[in-house]
C-alpha cells in the first residue's frame, strides 16, 4: 500500500449528501475480486447516459475537462453509506483519488478507505462548503492535505485542522494495510511464540 504523508491535488466536488456505495460502484460491476479496473465504473449511473458506459454525461463533474485528473473529492454528509462493499474505495482509488473530504462518512466505508490507502478527512459542513465554493470559483483549484500536520489548506490559503485515530494515521503514513501492520510485529510475534509453553503451540 502506498504511504501517505501529504498530497496536493486538483479537487472536484460532488455536492450531494448520502452518496451510497451502490452509487459509487453499482452492484453489476462487483464480480472481480482484485482491486484494479474499477475506476472506469466509478459513479457509473451518473457518469454515463447508457448502461454500456459508451455515452458520457457531459453535465457530471468527473466528465468535465476542468476536473480531469482530480485526486481530491469533496462530498457532503454521510458519504459511503449503504452496503459495506470494499469495492467502493477500490473504485475511488483506481480512478485516481487519494483523499475524500466530507463532514461525515459511513463507519464501514471510513474504515475500508483507510485499509486501502484512501484518506477520509472529516471537516465541518461550513469548511467543506468553503472548499466547494473555492473549487467552483477557480478552474484548476488545488487543495493540500497534510497527514503529518493534520491540516487541509484551501485554494485561497485557509488552513483547517482535522483529526484521525492515531492507529489509522500510523497505517497510512507507513503504507500498512492489515497484513502489513501484522507483519510489522513479526519479530515480537516470533519472540512470543518461542517463549510460550509447548502445550500451547
Swiss-Prot record:
Catalytic activity: (2R,3S)-3-isopropylmalate = (2S)-2-isopropylmalate
Subunit structure and binding partners: Heterodimer of LeuC and LeuD.
Involved pathway(s): Amino-acid biosynthesis; L-leucine biosynthesis; L-leucine from 3-methyl-2-oxobutanoate: step 2/4
A molecular function GO annotation: 3-isopropylmalate dehydratase activity
GO BP annotations listed: L-leucine biosynthetic process
CDD domains given in the database record: IPMI_Swivel
Record-stated family: Belongs to the LeuD family. LeuD type 1 subfamily.
Enzyme class: lyase
Record's function text: Catalyzes the isomerization between 2-isopropylmalate and 3-isopropylmalate, via the formation of 2-isopropylmaleate.
Protein name per Swiss-Prot or TrEMBL: 3-isopropylmalate dehydratase small subunit
Record keyword Amino-acid biosynthesis present: yes
Keywords: Amino-acid biosynthesis, Branched-chain amino acid biosynthesis, Leucine biosynthesis, Lyase
EC number per UniProt: 4.2.1.33
Domain of life, source organism: Bacteria
One cellular component term from this protein's GO annotations in UniProt: 3-isopropylmalate dehydratase complex
InterPro entries membership: 3-IsopropMal_deHydase_ssu, Aconitase/3IPM_dehydase_swvl, AconitaseA/IPMdHydase_ssu_swvl, IPMI_Swivel, LeuD
Pfam family, one: Aconitase_C
Amino acid at each position: 500500500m502506498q504511504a501517505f504523508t501529504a498530497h496536493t491535488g486538483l479537487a472536484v466536488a460532488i455536492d450531494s449528501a448520502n452518496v451510497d456505495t451502490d452509487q459509487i460502484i453499482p452492484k453489476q460491476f462487483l464480480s472481480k475480486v482484485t482491486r484494479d479496473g474499477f475506476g472506469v465504473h466509478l459513479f457509473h449511473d451518473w457518469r454515463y447516459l447508457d448502461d454500456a458506459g459508451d455515452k458520457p454525461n457531459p453535465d457530471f463533474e468527473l466528465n468535465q475537462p476542468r476536473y480531469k485528473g482530480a485526486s481530491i473529492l469533496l462530498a457532503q454528509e454521510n458519504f459511503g453509506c449503504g452496503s459495506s462493499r470494499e469495492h467502493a474505495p477500490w473504485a475511488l482509488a483506481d480512478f485516481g483519488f487519494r483523499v475524500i473530504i466530507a463532514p461525515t462518512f459511513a463507519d464501514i466505508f471510513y474504515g475500508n478507505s483507510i485499509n486501502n490507502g484512501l484518506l477520509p478527512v472529516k471537516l465541518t459542513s461550513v469548511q467543506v462548503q468553503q472548499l466547494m465554493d473555492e473549487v467552483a470559483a477557480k478552474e484548476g483549484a488545488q487543495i493540500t492535505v497534510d497527514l503529518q500536520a493534520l491540516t487541509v489548506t484551501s485554494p485561497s490559503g485557509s488552513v483547517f485542522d482535522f483529526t484521525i485515530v492515531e492507529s489509522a494515521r500510523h497505517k497510512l503514513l507507513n503504507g500498512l494495510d492489515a497484513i502489513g501492520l501484522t507483519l510489522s510485529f513479526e519479530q515480537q510475534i516470533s519472540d512470543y511464540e518461542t517463549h510460550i509453553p509447548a502445550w500451547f503451540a
